[in-house]
């Protein structure tokens, strides 16, 4: 396989090829207007950033941090840092003061780049507690800088330190010295058990990952890739860099809450997403079907059935559809299914990689049935995203996570653990020798902590090994499987399954309050607060009955028998969620110990 150019110079190589073609579409902070930046302009800004970093005293292998939501400045900073051999460390925009203080001190960060007021305020408050930290550089010009803060500098003013490229000869020399073995990023994992470790990623890992993914993921310079997930997340970072490296036009969505509007305004052809996004799409479409006329419901259900037979039964298995089915699909696609995709802004869709959690089979079938090419995959921060994914040249199975990408050796070890070896796998965790010894087998395979199996070359996951529950009857429960089925329901927003050393499975449920409140009003349920709503027997009965319908495919011992409705969301602030919005089970179980015990009272 052909290797790609080093990340330190990739922006400039692409500018030579694509010139004034748009590289990025984005919105400035506080603006509702989409703007474009060409490859040439981006290359120039990256050079300015590299020069500015040297002028402010940065030296090769120094650490910088980026504490921001997605924005153009984020990418300028990253690639500017790569150009002068700095290590860029991304922080989630939602990270707490305690988290960023720990990461800054652990990695000995010198400069921190922040997005908006919230991130600046947190960085300013912990500045004195971080002895290596010298500068806070602010992306959003409207941020109010604290009085007497000599460390703060707006990004516009930071770039002025690089105007005219005064240190470009030194930058060019650093390009020549760039090595694939150099450290590129440290990504701190927000583990579901609370521990945070810095995953070391080198330029060589990126080179291997981009090369392998380009061989199996159908993205090209004809695509428009929407950046939806935080670029701090390795899945989004990997897919953004892949899209950029092949010359795709990248659309930067800054506010995740505006993603639906952004999609309708910009019509992307590609976007990486997590299963929860598609669950929400599925629920919204079903809600519209339910409110339609009987004739419209019948037509749509027929279209979905045709779409399922064409896209799932035939295309997914690489079977040729019959002439009649092909003609029937062409008709329903043109008259009905395309309208669904258009309403989502996905009528020009190419591929939509999906990973980060288990995809409910019902949701995966639905997405394919409406003609959206969901590419399900599996990966970790430690593997620089993709380990495996569905491929266009091979049959795929609903519920699987695809085939290993080129260069990745996957085998199943003790306890059915998925083990990995290959050029994209991290060399280890930053300053964590003990953790590094535990992370690898004696023969050099990385321990993923995920249980799974391989069938006909395709990888299937069971659950996180540490999450597997054993009931008091000796039966094993995979909570993510149960939760993924329950989350399909429109009345349920969050769920935490309980089963370990218990007689049966129960669940803590956070309702989708808007819809449950509407249902309650329609059915004469009186309530004055969310606490009243969650305590109401009629509401509890309705939700439990819906759960029983959803979990019919599960074995009897896997099925949820009792539920407790929680009147507020699991949150980052309470420590119940990681920055990637995964449930921290030990914290949730501790916070709701009383409610859990009540479910098991005789």
Task: For every predicted segment, state its role.
Residues 207-224, 231-334, 348:
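Conserved AMP-binding/adenylation subdomain of ANL enzymes
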Residues 19-22, 137-138, 163-188, 195, ...:
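Conserved pre-ATP/AMP-binding loop-to-beta segment of ANL
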Residues 56, 83-161, 542-548:
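Structural core segment of the AMP-binding/adenylate-forming
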Residues 24-71, 75-79, 96-101, 154-163, ...:
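Conserved AMP-binding/adenylate-forming core of the ANL superfamily
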Residues 36-40, 184-210:
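Conserved AMP-binding A3 loop
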């Amino acid at each position: 396989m052909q290797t790609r150019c080093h990340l330190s110079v990739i922006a400039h190589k692409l500018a030579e090829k694509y010139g004034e073609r748009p590289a990025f579409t984005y919105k400035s902070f506080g603006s509702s207007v989409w703007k474009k930046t060409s490859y040439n302009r981006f290359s120039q800004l990256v050079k300015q950033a590299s020069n500015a970093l040297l002028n402010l005293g940065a030296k090769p292998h120094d650490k910088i941090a980026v504490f921001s939501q997605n924005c153009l400045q984020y990418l300028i900073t990253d690639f500017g840092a790569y150009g002068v051999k700095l290590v860029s460390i991304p922080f989630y925009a939602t990270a707490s003061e305690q988290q960023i203080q720990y990461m800054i001190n652990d990695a000995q960060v010198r400069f921190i780049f922040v997005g908006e007021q919230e991130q600046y305020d947190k960085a300013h408050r912990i500045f004195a507690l971080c002895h290596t930290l010298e500068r806070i550089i602010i992306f959003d010009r409207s941020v109010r800088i604290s009085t007497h803060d000599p460390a703060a500098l707006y990004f516009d003013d930071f770039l002025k330190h690089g105007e005219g490229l005064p240190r470009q000869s030194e930058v060019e020399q650093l390009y020549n010295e760039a090595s694939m073995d150099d450290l590129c990023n440290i990504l701190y994992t927000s583990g579901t058990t609370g521990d945070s470790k810095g995953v070391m990623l080198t330029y060589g890992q990126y080179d291997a990952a981009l090369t392998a993914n380009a061989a199996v993921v159908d993205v090209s310079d004809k695509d428009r890739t929407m950046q939806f997930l935080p670029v701090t997340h390795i899945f989004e970072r990997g897919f953004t860099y892949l899209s950029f490296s092949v010359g795709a036009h990248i659309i930067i969505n800054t506010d995740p809450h505006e993603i639906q509007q952004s999609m309708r305004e910009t019509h992307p052809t590609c976007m990486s997403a997590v299963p929860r996004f598609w669950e929400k799409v599925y629920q919204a479409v079903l809600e519209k079907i339910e409110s339609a006329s009987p004739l419209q419901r019948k037509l749509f259900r027929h279209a979905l059935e045709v779409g399922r037979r064409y896209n799932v039964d035939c295309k997914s298995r690489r079977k040729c559809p019959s002439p009649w089915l092909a003609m029937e699909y062409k008709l329903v696609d043109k008259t009905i299914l395309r309208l669904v995709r258009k309403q989502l802004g996905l009528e020009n869709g190419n591929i939509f990689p999906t990973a980060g959690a288990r995809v409910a089979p019902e949701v995966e079938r639905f997405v394919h049935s409406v003609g959206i090419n969901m590419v399900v995959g599996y990966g970790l921060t430690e593997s620089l995203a993709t380990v495996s994914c569905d491929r266009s040249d091979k049959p795929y199975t609903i519920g699987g996570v695809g085939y290993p990408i080129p260069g990745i050796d996957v085998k199943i070890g003790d306890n059915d653990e998925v083990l990995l070896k290959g050029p994209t796998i991290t060399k280890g965790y930053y300053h964590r020798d003990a953790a590094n010894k535990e992370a690898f087998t004696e023969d050099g395979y990385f321990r993923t902590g995920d249980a799974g199996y391989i069938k006909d070359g395709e990888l299937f996951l069971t659950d996180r090994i540490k999450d597997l529950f054993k009931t008091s009857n000796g039966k094993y429960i995979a909570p993510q499987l149960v939760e993924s089925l329950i989350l399909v329901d429109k009345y349920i927003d969050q769920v935490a399954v309980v089963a370990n050393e218990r007689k049966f499975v129960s669940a803590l449920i956070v309702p989708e309050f808007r819809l449950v409140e509407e249902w309650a009003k329609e059915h004469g349920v009186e309530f004055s607060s969310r606490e009243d709503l969650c305590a109401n027997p009629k509401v509890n009965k309705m939700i439990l009955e819906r759960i029983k319908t959803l979990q019919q495919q599960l074995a009897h011992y896997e099925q949820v028998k009792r539920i407790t409705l929680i009147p507020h969301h699991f949150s980052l602030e309470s420590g119940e969620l990681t920055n990637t919005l995964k449930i921290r089970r030990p914290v949730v179980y501790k916070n709701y110990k009383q409610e859990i015990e009540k479910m098991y009272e005789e």
